[in-house]
UniProtKB/Swiss-Prot annotation:
Homodimer. The keyword Mitochondrion does not apply. This is Threonine--tRNA ligase. It comes from the Bacteria. Zn(2+) binds at residues 333, 384, 510. Binds 1 zinc ion per subunit. It is found in: Cytoplasm. It catalyses: tRNA(Thr) + L-threonine + ATP = L-threonyl-tRNA(Thr) + AMP + diphosphate + H(+). One of its GO terms (molecular function) is ATP binding. Residues 242-533 are annotated as: Catalytic. It holds the Pfam family TGS. Signal peptide: none annotated. The gene is thrS. InterPro entries: aa-tRNA-synt_IIb, aa-tRNA-synth_II, aa-tRNA-synth_II/BPL/LPL, Anticodon-bd, Anticodon-bd_dom_sf, Beta-grasp_dom_sf, TGS, TGS-like.
């Protein structure tokens, strides 16, 4: 007689093993109809699964996050059902859930086309309209093998070989179609109406380019059509903001096949890059950092000492010269330790904060490259703080404060923090880890910031804090990192003389705020849709004459602004003023200055914003002061 305890503490007693669906029915017909699955003693199970013991039960519906994940997973199986009906010779591979959607990898004799995707989606809708039950059968291993052998599903057989310890497996039947899965899945296709197939891409079996190529059909699914419509609107907005499209339209940068994963910065984009670098340089100088520059090509001996050669060599670009092996640095840390090691340090010299705008290269897979967001050549706002154990908390707190200030200057207020603690495999004593984790937690708490704890997610050499930004579309971007390291100073012989005149290894704090300049600029482009705040805009003001008579004064205004440290340019083309205003509005120049005869006479400019707001006519000096205030506000003006 199982006693079922529900989330509100109420209990229900049954005189026989009972399914999740039956428990839901005993509560109410409405809940039974909405039941997707259950969570028994904290474990997700199918609605049809029996409970034969006293247990806690949470009914899972589409309103729950787990319910939406189950809907997405079941939609992937529905893709399989539709594909096998339309293309019977296709071989189904795997169909997992991903962030906000799902995909299915498929082997087929020809590439799918957009028309094929439309046909698959239409067939899926027809199958949903049949309102059929999805039937789960736990099946002995040998029978599972026979099922997929008889259907010619070679990839499923290979996946079964990967699970030698599984004696029985869940088979889920969508009418005549069958798929293998741990589940759970929806009990009926009526839950799958709010879906859409989104794109096609290539993939490889087991993710290895040496293996056979597959086709990947992506889709998204939601609890209801309202959520689906909101998602589609968000995706359309994100496409409008795609940094690759805006990068071309605003003449910021380009990439090309001859240099995959490398960025060709154009004058406009390089201006943004330089403003970013100059800003970070000033911020770091004000906060006690010493800027250094280290080599890009370093002998493998150093990478062997640091451990990178053994653990990271496949991601490093290497070369050989005069019988010596070299690597282009994928990160700056070992080189920074070399600078620290020049001369024995005293505890009085700590903390020592070494910063570098370090150019790094990593041999990322070509399929992973994405505009300037995921590249092979990038520059980090990298710094390493060498300090004593006693200084860990103060240095961490100072960095957290600095990071929040920097993000606010770029217009980001919604910051998410995660604290990752010790993994099972690690270096350093338990006491050292205790102190390090306590230092990071105390630093976060002293800043009054909420954070998510991620037990076991730290690196083997120390705990870390991750800083993520939420942009205007609600997307979360992990950018900043504060990583404590007990390992590298030991491996590379970094020492200092303590107060007791003993040699000790410093703690090393790896830290970055932006992450990489390239990716951060990509985030800024998409966040602002290319309409950078005045302080970042490649051109802050454009001066336009109405006729040739005002050309000389327009050039004088340009000189005045540029000599004042601003970025202004003239547009003296013999075009209608409306045409010029529209063109520079599309180029997202913050301020558009129009000069006619009256402005020449009064030594003034008529000022418009790119949003079309008429700020009126004002003396040049007044505009200069207004622009100076806008630049000084940085991105914080977007928060007011």
């Amino acid at each position: 007689m199982p006693i079922i305890t529900l989330p509100d503490g109420s209990q229900r007693t049954f005189d026989h093993p009972v399914s999740v669906a039956e428990v839901a029915q005993s509560i109410g017909a409405g809940l039974a109809k909405a039941t997707v699955a259950g969570k028994v003693d904290g474990k997700l199970v199918d609605a049809c699964d029996l409970i034969d013991h006293d247990a806690t039960l949470q009914i899972i519906t589409p309103k729950d996050e787990e319910g939406v994940e189950i809907i997405r997973h079941s939609c992937a199986h529905l893709v399989g059902h539709a594909v096998k009906q339309l293309y019977p010779t296709a071989k189904m591979v795997i169909g997992p859930v991903i962030d906000e959607g799902f995909y299915y990898d498929i082997a087929y004799e020809r590439p799918f086309t957009p028309e094929d995707v439309a046909a698959i989606e239409q067939r899926m809708r027809e199958l949903i309209d049949r309102d059929y039950d999805v039937v789960k059968k736990m099946t002995p291993r040998e029978q599972v093998i026979e099922v997929f052998k008889s259907r010619g599903e070679d990839y499923k057989l290979r996946l079964i070989d990967d699970m030698p310890d599984e004696k029985a497996m869940g088979l889920y039947y969508h009418e005549e179609y069958v798929d293998m899965c741990r589940g759970p899945h929806v009990p009926n296709t009526r839950f799958l109406k709010a879906f859409k197939l989104t794109k096609l891409s290539g993939a490889y079996w087991r993710g290895d380019a040496k293996n056979e190529q597959l086709q990947r059909v992506y889709g998204t699914a939601w609890a209801d059509k309202k959520q689906l419509a909101a998602y589609i609107q968000r995706i359309e907005e994100a496409e409008k903001r795609d940094h690759r499209k805006l990068g071309k339209r605003l003449d910021l940068f380009h990439t090309q096949e001859e240099a995959p994963g490398m960025v060709f910065w154009h004058p406009n984009g390089w201006t943004v890059y330089q403003v970013l670098e100059q800003y970070m340089r000033a911020v770091q100088r004000e906060n006690g950092y010493l800027e250094i520059k280290t080599p890009q090509v370093v002998d493998r001996v150093l990478w062997e000492k640091s451990g990178h050669w053994a653990n990271y060599a496949e991601n490093m670009f290497t070369t050989e010269s005069e019988s010596r092996d070299y690597a282009i640095k994928p990160m700056n840390c070992p080189c920074h330790v070399q600078v620290y090691n020049q001369g024995l340090k005293s505890y009085r010299e700590l903390p020592l904060r070494l910063a570098e705008f370090g150019a790094c290269h990593r041999n990322e897979p070509s399929g992973a490259l994405h505009g300037i967001m995921r590249v092979r050549g990038f520059t980090q706002d990298d710094a390493h703080i060498f300090c004593t154990e006693e200084q860990m908390q103060a240095e961490s707190a100072a960095f957290i404060k600095l990071t929040r200030q920097v993000y606010a200057d770029f217009g980001f207020q919604d910051i998410q923090l995660k604290l990752s603690t010790r993994p099972e495999r690690r270096v350093g004593s338990g006491e050292l880890w205790d102190r390090a984790e306590e230092a990071l937690a105390a630093a976060l708490e002293s800043a009054g910031l909420p954070y998510e704890l991620q037990p076991g997610e730290g690196a083997f050499y120390g705990p870390k804090i991750e800083f993520s930004l939420k942009d205007c579309l609600g997307r979360v971007w992990q950018c900043g990192t504060l990583q404590l390291d007990f390992n590298l100073p030991v491996r590379l012989g970094a020492e200092y003389v303590s107060e007791n005149n003993e040699r000790q290894h410093p703690v090393m704090l790896h830290r970055a705020i932006l992450g990489s300049f390239e990716r951060f600029i990509g985030i800024l482009i998409e966040h602002y849709e290319g309409a950078f705040p005045a302080w970042l805009a490649p051109t802050q003001a454009v001066i336009m004459n109405i006729t040739d008579k005002q050309g000389e004064f327009a050039l004088e205004v340009e000189r005045t602004l540029n000599q004042g440290g601003f970025r202004a340019k003239c547009d003296l083309r013999n075009e209608k003023i409306g045409f010029k205003i529209r063109e520079h509005t599309l180029l997202k120049v913050p301020y558009l200055l129009v000069i006619g005869d009256r402005e020449v006479e009064t030594h003034s400019v008529a000022v418009r914003t790119r949003e079309g707001v008429d700020l009126g006519t004002m003396p040049v000096e007044q505009f200069r002061e207004m622009l100076a205030q806008a630049v000084a506000r940085r991105g914080r003006q977007e928060l007011e």
